[in-house]
Amino acid sequence: MKVAVLYSGGKDSNYALYWALKEGFDVKYLVNVESENKESYMFHIPNVHLTELSAEAVGIPLIKLYTKGEKEKEVEDLKKGLEKLDVEGIVTGAVASIYQKSRIDRVCEELGLKSFAPLWHKDPEWILRTVSELFNVRIVGVYAYGLGKEWLGKRITKENIDKLLNICEKYGIHKAFEGGEAETFVFDAPMFKKRIEVVEAEIEWHETWGIYHIKKAKLVDKE
């Protein structure tokens, strides 16, 4: 089956891509939606410019869509972009947001496409542990009390994941960050032919939240 994967470069959309390839789907496109609205209900924001490197690393064409990020209108912008693609299904990294999934399902139904969400209602702790084992995944944004500046740019590993999960438990943070408490970016994965290396980055910090801005990055051979 020919599919497109909605792709932000984060842990969930990379898992969706990993799953689709493992299932034997013919992944024709990665579709990234760039929103002008930093508070977008639908689309992941930090470091989306790096998805071009991600797509190159995987060897799958990237389709960039743009939206002002106005509620509901951004769904129409997604639909307009998807209807041009020669695919039979859409794969997403939706975990628990009924807001997101119901709208993607509706778009797929209207376009006659199948909708796949391999992480839907999976255990959040299982998700975080699985993606951190499969991928080189780093935290690139923190937006919840309890997650401090020290996590920005940090890779989630077997050495620190228990500490991270304990913080989530203590402060009521969703363990897969489904509420937008943190954002991630994947720098290497089994389906990447090369890995992404950060050349230049800076941390923006505002007392209770912050972003790891990747100014420059490049593809390098895997070791």
UniProtKB/Swiss-Prot annotation:
Signal peptide: none annotated. InterPro entries: Diphthami_syn_dom, DPH6/MJ0570, MJ0570, MJ0570_ATP-bd, Rossmann-like_a/b/a_fold. One of its GO terms (biological process) is protein histidyl modification to diphthamide. GO terms for molecular function: diphthine-ammonia ligase activity. SUPFAM superfamilies: Adenine nucleotide alpha hydrolases-like (SSF52402). This is Uncharacterized protein MJ0570.
